[in-house]
Amino acid sequence: MAGNTIGQLFQVTTFGESHGIALGCIVDGVPPGLSLSEADIQPDLDRRKPGTSRYTTPRREDDEVQILSGVFEGKTTGTSIGMIIKNADQRSQDYGDIKDRFRPGHADFTYQQKYGIRDYRGGGRSSARETAMRVAAGAIAKKYLREHFGVEVRGFLAQIGDVAIAPQVIEQIDWQQVNSNPFFCPDPSAVEKFDELIRQLKKEGDSIGAKLTVVAENVPVGLGEPVFDRLDADLAHALMGINAVKAVEIGDGFAVVNQRGSAHRDEMTPEGFLSNHAGGILGGISSGQPIVATIALKPTSSITIPGRSVNLANEPVEVITKGRHDPCVGIRAVPIAEAMVAIVLLDHLLRHKAQNR
């Protein structure tokens, strides 16, 4: 199974399944001398981990990361950093009914067709549980970006279903507000509506989609390798690799369809840009403006409402998903999206430095 590694100079490889013994990753390319311990990584994992609020899956995992290699006396050595997170709260018996059935909307059918075998327990490798290791690797990238380049990578939830934050809130994000509520939302009025919507969905046994935005500030000019490794192309690749993501926007994204060139172009003065419709990337290269990326996540198919499907023998069956699941996967996806953006940015920064010494 290929496709488990991302990056060229800053490279992350993950392994593990939802109900396996542990999850793990290997991070290559971290420069030597970075102060690093589990305490630097754990806060981001705590933001992603399940069971932290009534709005997410009740599965409880401590998600305590353990660094196995690549750090000596509190400093990175420049060698591979190995990390693991042990799984503790698996309930594999919840998935016995789908051993021979395909859950509609999930990767069950495609994994079975591609590999001829699948770990049906919690989705196995296709589960979003795997993203814990992306967050761990991303925490290292965020720390290096912040300490060595002053780059800040932060995200917020912009919409759940038809409830969206106010446009004026987006213009001036209050990051303290984002970190003060379980929705990672900068709009207090939207938080209340999110709460009502999620409560109703849990009663109905249904789920809902979401939209979230990641902003990277203080990114230097010049990152990106046209034409095939454009910065926006690599960001889109990384973000589309997150479970349940169905669309990626850079800057104004799909809204550009209704814009005119006279309005969309980011005009410049000696003092700088007058707008940022391009989301901080021009011609596939960072412009020095904040990089803005938005993703849309589908409603999870893990719901208790019966659905039609087929089994291994291609016979019609009814599927009712058991187990513990998020009514909106977009909530816990905020730190995951931050991690993927940070991984791409650090990789491109290292590539840019290597090319322009």
From Swiss-Prot:
Cofactor binding comment, as recorded: Reduced FMN (FMNH(2)).
Pfam families: Chorismate_synt
Keyword NADP listed: yes
Pathway linked to the protein: Metabolic intermediate biosynthesis; chorismate biosynthesis; chorismate from D-erythrose 4-phosphate and phosphoenolpyruvate: step 7/7
Keyword vocabulary terms for this entry: Amino-acid biosynthesis, Aromatic amino acid biosynthesis, FAD, Flavoprotein, FMN, Lyase, NADP
Recorded catalytic activity of this chain's protein: 5-O-(1-carboxyvinyl)-3-phosphoshikimate = chorismate + phosphate
PROSITE patterns for this protein: CHORISMATE_SYNTHASE_1 (PS00787), CHORISMATE_SYNTHASE_2 (PS00788), CHORISMATE_SYNTHASE_3 (PS00789)
NCBIfam families listed in its UniProt record: aroC (TIGR00033), PRK05382.1 (NF003793)
Complexes and interactors: Homotetramer.
Recorded family membership: Belongs to the chorismate synthase family.
Function statement: This reaction introduces a second double bond into the aromatic ring system.
Protein name as catalogued: Chorismate synthase
Gene source species: Pasteurella multocida (strain Pm70)
Lineage of the species this protein comes from: Bacteria, Pseudomonadati, Pseudomonadota, Gammaproteobacteria, Pasteurellales
